[in-house]
From Swiss-Prot:
Quaternary structure, from the entry: Homodimer.
UniProt protein name: Orotidine 5'-phosphate decarboxylase
Pathway assignment: Pyrimidine metabolism; UMP biosynthesis via de novo pathway; UMP from orotate: step 2/2
PROSITE patterns, alphabetized: OMPDECASE
Residue positions binding substrate: 22, 44, 71-80, 131, 192, 201, 221-222
NCBIfam families: PRK00230.1, pyrF
Length: 245
């Protein structure tokens, strides 16, 4: 099988920044995309935008040269999840994710569904603990260990299933690199440049701190999308990362 749209797992750009394209209006999203360079970032499409605009939005972004992270966090029975991941591969997305809490059989099925795509397969990432959750939130659902411990447990399971990495808090990055290895990709939301509001994220870091901790890809939303000059803000963040030893 080959992607009908675009091959996106080529590592063609070096930027670690993934901009969260969180808009309720497609025209606004595409207007933003037209203000930034696909050489400086990738774009993340989540549940709201994909529910509203579907595969057409992904194709529009691909036509503009962007790699797309399809952030739908699939969590279902193994067969359904596998089919959903294969559908994402058909769209040619660069990255797709599932919930690690769906278990080993679900994650293994998702990984197997991508085998026919070979080098054209998207990166398959698992979500460990949402960065909006803290220890109290975990206790509310019967998990008595800390967010860091739960993230490590699920990251190990993800690694055992052969996935490419996990979505995690930057606070867990150092430990997860030690446990799962340098080639295991860490994708981190909750990244806020110095002086930005935390919003609904509870466990946050600056871009510089995230890179120093070993994060491979950092998701940044409002500090860039709500900037009066998004490309300038994006390049300022990239410049700050070159100073990280």
């Amino acid at each position: 099988m080959t992607s009908a749209t675009k091959t996106n797992n080529s590592g063609s750009i070096s930027s670690p920044i993934v901009v969260a394209l969180d808009y309720a209006n497609k025209d606004a999203a595409l207007a933003f995309a037209d203000q930034v360079s696909p050489q400086d970032c990738r774009l993340k499409v989540g549940k709201e935008m994909f529910t509203l605009y579907g595969p057409e939005l992904i194709r529009d972004l691909h036509q503009r040269g962007f790699d797309v992270f399809l952030d739908l966090k699939f969590h279902d029975i193994p067969n359904t999840t596998a089919r959903a991941v294969a559908a994402a591969a058909e769209l040619g997305v660069w990255m797709v994710n599932v919930h690690a809490s769906g278990g080993a059989r679900m994650m293994s099925a998702a990984k197997e569904a991508l085998l026919p795509y070979g080098a054209q397969a998207p990166l398959l990432i698992a979500v460990t603990v949402l960065t909006s959750m803290d220890g109290e939130d975990l206790r509310d659902i019967g998990i008595t260990i800390s967010p860091a411990e739960q993230a490590e447990r699920l990251a190990k399971l993800t690694w055992d299933c052969g996935l490419d990495g996990v979505v995690c808090s930057a606070h867990e990055a150092v430990r997860l690199k030690q446990v799962c290895g340098e080639d295991f990709s860490l994708v981190t939301p909750g990244i806020r440049p110095q002086g930005s509001e935390a919003g609904d994220q509870r466990r946050i870091m600056t871009p510089e701190q995230a890179v120093a901790a070993g994060v491979d890809y950092m998701v940044i939303g409002r500090p860039i999308t709500q900037s009066p000059d998004p490309e300038k803000t994006l390049r300022e963040i990239l410049a700050s990362l070159t100073k990280v030893a």
